[in-house]
Amino acid sequence: MITISNLKKQFGETIACDIQALEIKDGEILGLVGNNGAGKTTLFRMLLDLLKPDAGTVTLDGINPAESEAWKDKTGAYIDDSFLIEFLTPEEYFAFLGKISGLSQEEVDNRLKHFERFASGEIFGQKKLIRNLSAGNKQKVGIIAALFYKPQLVILDEPFNFLDPSSQNILKHVLTDYNKETGATILISSHNLQHTIDISTRITLLEKGVVIKDLSNVEGSAKTELENYFETEV
């Protein structure tokens, strides 16, 4: 379980995060939505100990990520391409990830087979460094890397960005299947409301760092309330 209490972050005069209380249960797929500047990425960065809060606490299964690294073994995340090692090819990158986690090359290859449809023949065997891939293919490498270790907590910031429509739909299946197979908790942020509604079991709406709505989403039940809030069709 993720527990957030009185979490605050401010940049100058701008309040980026002011969450009084939020609990995310094991096995949920939580979608974070909100307009630009809502604080979604800021929250994720604090969850991953990439950004220090001004006040308050975050705990992952009772562990404060700022005080212990025990949470890292069961967490996979992709925020942006700074998470990648861009002077490697995708093959070299995943071989490196396998090596530091004690996996044989055969085990690495077997894990990557699960993502063949998502990779869609555009990542591997291209003889390209990651830095020379398109934005969409970099995104795929990052998402696959986040899932590669079979983590129990997955955090993805705007995972549908840069992906073509086919890849977006495949990714929805990748994430929901992963959740069903492993029971992992998945957190995503997205400006794509329909995709968020399609895969999330719960949707939290942030505006200016504050939780405005926290909605259960059973078979798309949050759709109408989100439509009314954003005054647009999703």
Can you name each region flagged by the protein language model?
Residues 189-191:
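H-loop/switch region of ABC-family ATPase nucleotide-binding domains
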Residues 154-158:
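Catalytic Walker B motif of ABC-type/P-loop ATPase nucleotide-binding domains
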Residues 56-71, 213:
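Conserved ABC transporter NBD signature motif
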Residues 129-133:
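Conserved ABC ATPase signature
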Residues 48:
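Helix-to-loop junction immediately C-terminal to a conserved catalytic motif
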Residues 33-35:
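The feature captures the beta-strand-to-loop junction immediately N-terminal to the Walker
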